[in-house]
Curated annotation (Swiss-Prot):
One of its GO terms (molecular function) is symporter activity. Coiled coil: none annotated. This is Probable potassium transport system protein Kup. The chain crosses the membrane at residues 7-27, 44-64, 98-118, 135-155, 166-186, 201-221, 245-265, 278-298, 335-355, 361-381, 394-414, 417-437. GO terms for cellular component: plasma membrane. InterPro entries: K+_transporter (IPR003855), K_trans_C (IPR053952), K_trans_N (IPR053951), Kup (IPR023051). Its main location: membrane. It catalyses: K(+)(in) + H(+)(in) = K(+)(out) + H(+)(out). It comes from Chlorobium chlorochromatii (strain CaD3). Pfam families: K_trans, K_trans_C. Transport of potassium into the cell. Likely operates as a K(+):H(+) symporter. Keywords: Cell inner membrane, Cell membrane, Ion transport, Membrane, Potassium, Potassium transport, Symport, Transmembrane, Transmembrane helix, Transport. It is found in: Cell inner membrane. It is a multi-pass membrane protein.
Length: 620
């Protein structure tokens, strides 16, 4: 029970930060945004009803009850879900397999846009509360937001280990304050609780028609953090997340939203910022400080999520090797990816300056998350149909309901395409193109390399016929295919006419599971005459290092000394060929990514002084 409580408190700071800061802007956008609706009892009741049932249907039912069942060895998230499908659905034809990979990758690409917008809108909306206290400080809100964001991104390389223990208590205080503020206003206007009944939402949509449909885009802002609940499942487990949601987060959110609704009916003039309207004048400054702290924590969770997503994409072969730094010796999940960090910082600050207010940013926010949720629903359908063999009639009815809700929110959010919703879609399209180009380019590259080499069996037979000179020592050659001889070894043998007395061919394989247990991580095959084949299997959440592989291989008879090994790598220079399945601009993009990828020496933590790189020119 004590461990459960600790996990629940930790989950508060990481999992619920995004959805927990939605009260800062969700209600405001419904009544004061670009498509704001008139403030009257019917509209307030209708919006609150839609908001309540969105939280119940999307978060409580869809995500916490159903989608969280679809875990990949305990891990959640759209890439983990895609990997689960690809691993198990072997019977899927080529077109269906490509469809699943494509939508899964596009869903992951959408999260990059979300990771850029969330810090911008969250911190900006919190600091906008300053003008409630001192309107003269209005012009300082943008500079203050940029300053906070710069500090946030500059501190990423330190990791969250030191301050992470504060996240849970701060967000706990945040939710308690949310609930108390809302409850005070509800007690003044208890009739607002009638909005819980769903017919108010239905009548709102019927009476307001197209305008009411447009407001759905603002209503959706209340559930934008739902995907994080699923993505962070592997860190905290299903039970702590579900319990924390049911007994703290959901009640606090509902109380605050109902409180804001009651405030609007009592004081419509507060529509420009109903959240801060709940706060007594003496508490505005402390509330701005608490809100800013909560939004920084929510932003931190999104940034960390982008780092984790990038690492998964690298391990699964959808992005080139990038520098990944572990910021904690105890927790493997705490990483820092400099390239992702600086890209996010530039994009986030540009959004703050370009849009200028959280209200304008809200138009860009929803479409990325609605599209991701739509893709998660589709992937879940395939899991339930192909892996779990659910009753098709029941499954089809359930999926149709979820899809109708997802499509309604997506349509409402996409209606703001020219008001900023284009931004996350462009980011997603760029990232999707990058990932697909890298995957296809690597496939073409490996095909070219395979056509120029020998199988291990052919090579061993040729050695028996013409044995080369062997010098004392140990050599490791990295190979992309465990059944083929790396070109680096063939080139070395052709030019130097010599091989080491002990040679090991190392192949690193990323499995479509989060982690591989140590007893299955390394396989050593003795080929004879001093040759070995070593296959190291890692999960997509793990970080392979040569020292760990050598230590595990030592138990299987490979007695190589790390300080005595010569490591041979091939360094390919990519040139565009005449005939290829890739267009010329994608070939050039792949070549640029290949040149800028970090070397295998850095990625696998090889000792630089013991590495020999052999250059190869390859046409694709």
């Amino acid at each position: 029970m004590k461990r459960l409580g600790g996990l629940a408190l930790a989950a508060l700071g990481v999992v619920f930060g995004d959805i927990g800061t939605s009260p800062l802007y969700a209600i405001r956008e419904c009544f004061h945004g670009d498509y704001g609706i008139a403030i009257n009892e019917a509209n307030v009741f209708g919006v609150l009803s839609l908001l309540v049932w969105s939280l119940l249907l999307i978060v409580s039912l869809k995500y916490l009850t159903f989608i969280m069942k679809a875990d990949n060895d305990g891990e959640g998230g759209i890439l983990a879900l895609t990997a689960l499908l690809i691993r198990h659905c072997k019977k899927n034809g080529g077109s269906e397999r490509f469809f699943l990979i494509a939508i899964g990758l596009f869903g992951a690409a959408l999260l990059y846009g979300d990771g850029m917008i969330t810090p911008a809108i969250s911190v900006l909306s919190a600091l906008e509360g300053v003008q409630m206290v001192a309107p003269a400080f209005h012009d300082l809100i943008i500079p203050a937001t940029v300053t906070v964001l710069v500090i946030l991104f500059l501190f990423q390389h330190h990791g969250t280990a030191r301050v992470g223990t504060l996240f849970g208590p701060v967000i706990l205080l945040w939710f308690v304050v949310l609930g108390v503020l809302g409850l005070v206003e509800i007690l003044r206007y208890p009739q607002i609780l009638q909005a819980f009944f769903p017919w108010h939402g239905i009548m709102f949509l019927l009476n307001n028609q197209l305008h009411g449909f447009m407001v759905l885009g603002a209503v959706f802002l209340s559930v934008t953090g739902a995907e994080a609940l699923y993505a962070d499942m592997g860190h905290f487990g299903k039970r702590p997340i579900r319990l924390t949601w049911a007994f703290l987060v959901l009640p606090a959110l509902l109380l605050n939203y109902f409180g804001q609704g009651a405030l609007l009916l009592d004081s419509p003039a507060d529509a420009h910022h109903p959240f801060y309207g709940l706060v007594p004048s003496w508490g505005l400054i402390p509330m701005v400080i608490l809100s800013t702290s909560a939004t920084i924590i929510a932003s931190q969770a999104l940034i960390t999520g982008v780092f984790s997503l990038t690492q998964q994409a690298i391990q699964l072969g959808y992005l080139p090797r990038l520098t990944v730094t572990h910021t904690s010796a105890k927790h493997m999940g705490q990483i820092y990816v400099p390239a992702a960090n600086w890209s996010l910082m530039v994009a986030t600050i540009s959004l703050v300056i370009g849009f200028g207010s959280s209200s304008k940013l809200a138009a860009a926010y929803g479409v990325a998350v609605t599209a991701t949720m739509l893709i998660s629903t589709i992937l879940f359908y395939y899991v339930a149909r192909d892996l779990w063999r659910w009753n098709k009639s029941v499954l089809n009815v359930m999926i149709v309901v979820f899809l109708l809700v997802d499509l309604a929110f997506f349509g409402a959010s996409a209606s703001k395409l020219f008001h900023g919703a284009w931004f996350p879609l462009v980011i997603a399209a760029v990232m999707f193109t990058v990932m697909m180009t890298w995957k296809q380019g690597r496939g073409l590259l490996l095909k070219q390399l395979q056509d120029r080499t020998l199988t291990v069996e052919e090579f061993m037979s040729s050695l028996a016929l013409q044995p080369p000179y062997r010098t004392n020592g140990q050599a490791v050659y990295l190979t992309a295919n465990p059944d083929l001889v790396p070109l680096a070894m063939l080139h070395n043998l052709r030019h130097n006419k010599v091989l080491h007395s002990e040679v090991a061919l190392f192949h690193f394989s990323t499995e479509r599971v989060p982690r591989v247990p140590n007893n299955r991580k390394v396989e050593v095959v003795k080929l004879g005459d001093g040759f070995y084949k070593v296959v190291a299997r890692y999960g997509f959440l793990e970080y392979p290092t040569i020292r760990q592989v050598l230590a595990l291989a030592n138990h299987q008879g490979l007695h190589f000394k790390p300080e005595a090994i010569s490591f041979f790598l091939s360094r390919e220079k990519i040139v565009a060929g005449v005939k290829s399945k890739m267009t010329i601009w994608r070939k050039k993009l792949f070549a640029v990514m290949s040149r800028n990828a970090i070397s295998a020496t850095s990625y696998y933590d090889l000792p630089p002084g013991q590495v020999i790189e052999i250059g190869l020119m390859v046409q694709i």
